[in-house]
Amino acid sequence: MITTRFAPSPTGFLHVGNIRTALINWLYARHHHGRFVLRIDDTDSERSTEEYTQAIRADLAWLNLNPDVEYSQSKRSELYEIRFESLKAKGRIYPCYETPQELDLKRRIAIGRGLPPIYDRAALNLTIEERSELEEKGIKPHWRFRLDHDHAIKWNDLIRGEQRFDPKLLSDPVIRRADGSWLYLLPSVIDDIDMEITTIVRGEDHVSNTATQIQMFQALEAELPEFAHMALLTGGDAKISKRFGADSVADFKADHIEPIALEALLARIGTSDPVEVLTDLAPLVENFDFSHFSRAPARFDMAELKHLNARILHITPYEQVADRLPEAMDAHSWEVIRPNIDDLSEAAFWWSVVKEDIAKPDLSAEDKAYLVEAMAIAKTLDWSSNPWKEWIDILKKQSGRKGKALFLPLRLALTGQSHGPDMAGLLSLIGHEKAIKRLEQAVK
């Protein structure tokens, strides 16, 4: 069974790049009728918080990307210890004693000599006695995974195609700190094996991590999953990450963005497929295909999202928004108002225009005289059906007005606004009695 995972660290709120990663993993799993796993990567105990964990769950629920199962790495340390010891017994993990300052000096010297700034494996040359002396001085080791330099690292990426790394050009990665806490790389591999993750989908900034993790999979004698590395999103001139203040779910909610609008855009930018106006995720699931993804950076444009949000609302059925509309606003009212709104908050505004008192418009004497004429005609019409077209036709003939001069004074008098939803529809909501009252108020 195809199984994907979304593995955020609860050290901050999800940003748009995280949301895209979660979405693509969810879509791929659902396309193959597989499983979508949420794994909270909370090994960083100092920065991980329950508040952020709860926010991640809430954000995924808002996006309708509900996982089939959830795990927390903080509850899995026993398994990590077992695998750590097995790799140590195989000689694939070794202790190192350099301080951060010493490592930084080594990097700067290597760069100065025109060499790759990778770890020189000096710790492998320490004797047992030298290690004991260092530890007797109170120096606790951190631990590195020893890369196999004899075999090139290769995989066929679902997006990037054939990938090849020379392990000699990579540093043996630190996998455990001196205080015993875990870094990202090894627990991630252990969990991917244990959770039977078949496909790892993430940003292209993880490509070098994948190279080292492939050797960890092999050292643990596990079958390799497939990998798909997406081009990073860009917003303006910089890649998007939570450390650069990119939009979070809270920001999108504050901007009244519909979840489906965000998902419809994120699923298609950076692919050869057009962004579609959708009201549910089904078409994105059905048509999902990694072969349509580009290696070029994908630009996330907030203006494009807001435009898409409006277009989606214009076709959204009443049933999908009824619980978020003003009380007593029915399906007919929604159909009248929805073609003219950019976000759902505007529905409440137009409902108030229909149901509540409006400000008296500032009109010229000429327009007031025109409205007196309009009111007289309105009182003669049959309001059992919508009289708007008949009303306008008569006014046009009798007044000689046309275009803006014909329509705008009526709109101002009846709604207090210079633009908005179609007046025929609005008039059906305002009704005969209120329409006459507003015309009377406007000409006073």
Curated annotation (Swiss-Prot):
Catalytic activity from the UniProt record: tRNA(Glu) + L-glutamate + ATP = L-glutamyl-tRNA(Glu) + AMP + diphosphate
Span of the annotated motif 'KMSKS' region: 239-243
Domain of life according to the entry: Bacteria
The protein's enzyme class: ligase
One of the record's GO cellular component terms: cytoplasm
GO MF annotation: an example: tRNA binding
One Pfam family, short name: tRNA-synt_1c
Any one GO BP annotation for this protein: glutamyl-tRNA aminoacylation
Annotated positions binding ATP: K242
Coiled coil: none
Location in or out of the cell: Cytoplasm
Keywords linked to the UniProt accession: Aminoacyl-tRNA synthetase, ATP-binding, Cytoplasm, Ligase, Nucleotide-binding, Protein biosynthesis
Motif ('HIGH' region): 8-18
EC numbers: 6.1.1.17
SUPFAM superfamilies the UniProt entry points to: An anticodon-binding domain of class I aminoacyl-tRNA synthetases, Nucleotidylyl transferase
Quaternary structure and partners: Monomer.
HAMAP family to which the protein is assigned, alphabetical: Glu_tRNA_synth_type1
Role noted for this protein: Catalyzes the attachment of glutamate to tRNA(Glu) in a two-step reaction: glutamate is first activated by ATP to form Glu-AMP and then transferred to the acceptor end of tRNA(Glu).
Family per similarity comment: Belongs to the class-I aminoacyl-tRNA synthetase family. Glutamate--tRNA ligase type 1 subfamily.
Protein name (database record): Glutamate--tRNA ligase 1
The organism of origin for this protein: Zymomonas mobilis subsp. mobilis (strain ATCC 31821 / ZM4 / CP4)
